[in-house]
């Protein structure tokens, strides 16, 4: 599994200021760390490779048990995914680093569906609104060929990938905005993001 992560200062720009009093880079790191925590706990994932040039992300990834690959292309998400997937010999997948409510069981279900249903083609999972993509898989011998970005669900379909269809709300709920974060909170955030959300809430008066 390839997990690309931007430098924290440049990541998740639409979330800037979403949690009053919480530094933006801390929130971006928490989203990635909780995503990575769930991916590493998924029994269907044999290896996790984080592609990043951010020192804090790299340290957190190594501490969690993932491999780290420098983002040598330094040319955006798709280039980072291609770079990370380049040496794969078997099944390979890429996931966005902004699904902090992710449950390992849901990721397992999606990966098994990709492998067991139409296993010779690339598969992708749209995000909750249905326009973006949170997960892309490729079978042995097929390039991952990522098309992440605005309208990526249509772009992946146009490239020949087939959509996955399953009940995986925590996997599909990526977080780009404060409203997305609130919805992920209702699903149940991972520990690092949950702690920051709690810290960013206004204190309730005793009266």
Locate the predicted segments by residue:
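N-terminal nucleotide-binding beta1-loop-alpha1 segment
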Residues: 1-16
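Short glycine-enriched, charge-decorated loop/helix-capping segments at active-site entrances
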Residues: 15-23
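Conserved core of the sugar-phosphate nucleotidyltransferase
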Residues: 102-186, 207
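Acidic donor-binding segment of Leloir-type glycosyltransferases
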Residues: 43-67
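The conserved acidic donor/metal-binding loop of glycosyltransferases
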Residues: 96-100
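A short, N-terminal amphipathic alpha-helix
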Residues: 28-45
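Charge-dense polyanion-binding interfaces
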Residues: 191-207
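Short phosphate-binding loop-to-helix
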Residues: 60-93, 152-155
